Amino acid sequence: LMDGGLQRVAQAKGAMQHGNVALKGEQIGKAIAIIGGLRESLNHKQGGEVAGNLDSLYAFMQQRLSQANLRNEVALLDEVTELLREVKSGWDGIRQS
């Protein structure tokens, strides 16, 4: 899911830079849905505080994507990309342990 989210944000950024409003909105919508899937997969009973923190972070990312869509701001897409990369790096590190 993380890779899919990163791809959708990158595609939205390209669409934004080329003035393709329809594609931008479509890709941002898909990225928001992917992050929603990540939120839904959180197990708050087992994950405790970590799951709660991730839920808040994912909600923040969804909000920033919506703002990027409304404001046409590439910087907000870049912000979400960095956050997704950091979370992905953390999960990848756990898997390698």
Spans of model-derived segments:
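N-terminal intrinsically disordered, cationic/polar leader segments
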Residues: 1-10, 17-18, 22-29, 36, ...
